[in-house]
């Protein structure tokens, strides 16, 4: 979270204020430049500000703005320095515009990186259970996953078993219809993976 601390006042007297809303918009724009100008362009990275709250009336310059967002990357080094990079940008923009700030960064999940050898075992076992035409390798995604903490300590593979119904609402939707009968395929796949890895 980023809290911009400005000086509020009447909209007709902006010269007597430090407009936290304006400072916040500059912060949002500057944060996007971390990805476009400070990270290798062949390395996927995301900085998203998903929440921005400032002001309570059309004719009052707000003294405070609150921004919240998230960062994502597949690179462990980039993941470990997000906080310092973000705060440096916030401090620079706020300093240039005469505002103060409060900065709080929650690190969240590290990148989820599968072990190639274990992933091969999972793929082979899944094919033996559901057939090659039903096993797909999805595109990389920036979604966070707590499995990443396990994969940092032990070689493994994060994989998903489709349990949606044709034409039904997707996962993370209040109308999602979980196909319980497909859990048996997941159990069989897990069992075969365990037997294969245990030799």
Where are these regions (language model features)?
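Conserved phosphate/oxyanion-binding catalytic-loop motifs
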Residues: 2
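Short, solvent-exposed loop/turn segments at secondary-structure boundaries
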Residues: 13-16, 81
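Metal-dependent amide/peptide-bond hydrolase catalytic core
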Residues: 22-199
């Amino acid at each position: 979270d980023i809290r911009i601390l400005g000086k509020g006042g009447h909209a007709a007297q902006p010269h007597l204020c430090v407009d936290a809303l304006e400072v916040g918009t500059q912060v949002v724009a500057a944060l996007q430049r971390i990805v476009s100008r400070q990270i290798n362009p062949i390395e996927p990275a995301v900085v998203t500000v998903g929440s921005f709250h400032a002001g309570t009336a059309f004719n009052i310059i707000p003294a405070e703005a609150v921004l919240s967002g998230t960062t994502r990357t597949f690179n462990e080094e980039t993941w470990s320095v997000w906080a310092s990079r973000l705060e440096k940008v916030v401090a620079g923009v706020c300093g240039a515009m005469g505002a103060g700030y409060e900065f709080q960064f929650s690190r969240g999940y590290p990148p989820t990186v599968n072990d190639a050898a274990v992933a091969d075992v999972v793929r082979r076992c899944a094919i033996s259970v559901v057939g090659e035409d039903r096993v797909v390798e999805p595109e990389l995604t920036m979604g966070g996953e707590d499995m990443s903490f396990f994969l940092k300590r032990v070689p493994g593979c994060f994989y998903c078993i489709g349990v949606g119904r044709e034409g039904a609402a997707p996962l993370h939707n209040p109308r999602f219809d979980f196909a319980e009968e497909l859990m048996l395929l997941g159990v069989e796949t897990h069992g075969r993976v365990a037997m294969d890895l245990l030799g």
